[in-house]
Swiss-Prot record:
Its EC number is 2.7.7.6. GO terms for cellular component: cytoplasm; DNA-directed RNA polymerase complex. It catalyses: RNA(n) + a ribonucleoside 5'-triphosphate = RNA(n+1) + diphosphate. HAMAP family: RNApol_bact_RpoA. Homodimer. The RNAP catalytic core consists of 2 alpha, 1 beta, 1 beta' and 1 omega subunit. When a sigma factor is associated with the core the holoenzyme is formed, which can initiate transcription. The keyword NAD does not apply. Residues 1-236 are annotated as: Alpha N-terminal domain (alpha-NTD). One of its GO terms (molecular function) is DNA binding. Residues 258-353 are annotated as: Alpha C-terminal domain (alpha-CTD). This is DNA-directed RNA polymerase subunit alpha. Belongs to the RNA polymerase alpha chain family. Pfam families: RNA_pol_A_bac, RNA_pol_A_CTD, RNA_pol_L. The N-terminal domain is essential for RNAP assembly and basal transcription, whereas the C-terminal domain is involved in interaction with transcriptional regulators and with upstream promoter elements.
Length: 353
C-alpha cells in the first residue's frame, strides 16, 4: 500500500503551547495552541472539552450511613440541617484516592460548631481536597456520626445506581460526580503566520476540583483521544513504504539488496550533501549532525534549541526532508548502525557505479 504522508505532514501543527495559570494554578489554567489549520481549533477544542468533562477518572462518595437515621427525609436532634441538605453537601466533597475502592471512611463530631470535610478520618491513600467544606452545624451537646463509602470511577453516576441489592436499612445512596474537571470552555481566534491570517488559535480554559492539575487533565484527555483514534490508523508511518526513494536523482535499490537492510537509503546520506543555506548547514555541523538519519530523529523543539538556529532554518529543513518523504521526530530503530561509515561508502559506490 502506498501511504501519502503529505496528508498529515503538510498540515500546520501548533509549534507552541502556552499555559496561562489562573488565580489558583492547581485548579485553573488556560492553554493556548497555535497555529492550527482553519477548522482544527473547533475540532480539537470540542473533542478535548467533551473528553475532559466525561472520561477522566476520579473519586467520589457513593453512599452514607448516619447514626440514628433511617432515610434521607429524616432530621437529627441538635443538627440544624436536614439529612437532604447534608446529602447535598456530601456530594461536593472532593477526594483524591489512590488504588481501588470501595472504601469506608468515618466522620464523628460533637457540638457546638461546624462539621467540615476536613473532619473526616481518612486513610493514607485518600485525601480530602476541600477541607473547609461545611457539611452541617451542630448545637450544644449534639453528636454526629456518619460512615461514608467512597469509590473511583468516571463521569456521573445517579444515586439509584449506587444502591446495592442487599443495602441495609439506613444506607443512603448519593449521586456521584467522579469527574475531577468542573468546567471547560474554549474560544477560537485567528492566528497569524507571516502575512497570512487564515489559521486558528485555540484557547482552552480548564478548571478542576484540585485533585488533578489542569495540565495533567488536558494531558489525560489528549492521551484518551490518541488511544481511541489509534484503531483507525492501519499503517506505520515511521519509515515511508510503498515506493523506492530517489537518492541524488538515481533510484535506490530495494533495502533487502544491500547491507542497509530495512533502512531508508536517504538516512545514510550526509547532511552536507543537502542544498541548505550556509546558516542551516553550519548549525547542523556545529550540533554534530552528520547523517540524515541523525537529523530526522531530532524534534522541532530540539532543533530550535540549537545556537543560531531559527524558525526560517527549521522550515527550510522540514521542506527538504518532506521532499524525501522524511520528517523530524522520527524513531529509527537501530540507528546509528555500527558499520555506518562502511554502509554509506557502499551506497555511494553503488550510486556512482
Amino acid at each position: 500500500m502506498t501511504v501519502n504522508i503529505k496528508n498529515w505532514q503538510e498540515l500546520k501543527k501548533p509549534n507552541n503551547l502556552e499555559i496561562k495559570p489562573g488565580n489558583d494554578s492547581k485548579r485553573r489554567a488556560t492553554f493556548v495552541a497555535e497555529p492550527l489549520e482553519r477548522g482544527f481549533g473547533l475540532t480539537l477544542g470540542n473533542a478535548l472539552r467533551r473528553v475532559l468533562l466525561s472520561s477522566l477518572q476520579g473519586a467520589a462518595v457513593t453512599s452514607i450511613k448516619i447514626e440514628n437515621v433511617l432515610h434521607e427525609f429524616s432530621s437529627l436532634a441538635g443538627v440544624r440541617e436536614d439529612v437532604t441538605d447534608i446529602v447535598l453537601n456530601v456530594k461536593q466533597i472532593a477526594l483524591k484516592m489512590q488504588g481501588e475502592g470501595p472504601k469506608r471512611l468515618q466522620l464523628s463530631a460533637t457540638g457546638p460548631g461546624e462539621v467540615k470535610a476536613g473532619d473526616i478520618a481518612v486513610t493514607g491513600d485518600i485525601e480530602v481536597m476541600n477541607k473547609d467544606l461545611v457539611i452541617c452545624h451542630l448545637d450544644e451537646g449534639a453528636t454526629f456520626n456518619m460512615e461514608l463509602t467512597v469509590d473511583t470511577g468516571k463521569g456521573y453516576v445517579p444515586a439509584v445506581s449506587n444502591r446495592p441489592v442487599d443495602a441495609p436499612i439506613g444506607l443512603i445512596p448519593v449521586d456521584s460526580l467522579y469527574s475531577p474537571v468542573r468546567q471547560v470552555s474554549y474560544k477560537v481566534e485567528n492566528a497569524r503566520i507571516g502575512q497570512e491570517l487564515d489559521y486558528d488559535k485555540l484557547n482552552l480554559t480548564v478548571e478542576t476540583d484540585g485533585t488533578v492539575t489542569p495540565e495533567d487533565a488536558v494531558a489525560y484527555a489528549a492521551r484518551i483521544l490518541q488511544d481511541q483514534l489509534a484503531l483507525f490508523v492501519h499503517f506505520d508511518d515511521q519509515v515511508p513504504v510503498g515506493h523506492v526513494p530517489m537518492v541524488a536523482g538515481v533510484p535506490a535499490h530495494a533495502p533487502e539488496e544491500s547491507d542497509a537492510n530495512q533502512l531508508n537509503r536517504y538516512l545514510l546520506k550526509k547532511v552536507d550533501e543537502l542544498e541548505l543555506s550556509v546558516r542551516s548547514a553550519n548549525c547542523l555541523k556545529n550540533d554534530n549532525i552528520i547523517y540524515i538519519g541523525d537529523l530526522v530523529q531530532k524534534t522541532e523543539a530540539e532543533m530550535l534549541r540549537t545556537p543560531n538556529f531559527g524558525r526560517k532554518s527549521l522550515n527550510e529543513i522540514k521542506e527538504v526532508l518532506s521532499s524525501m518523504g522524511l520528517r523530524l521526530g522520527m524513531d529509527i530503530p537501530g540507528w546509528p548502525p555500527e558499520n555506518i561509515e562502511e554502509m554509506a561508502k557502499k551506497l555511494e559506490q553503488e550510486l556512482l557505479g
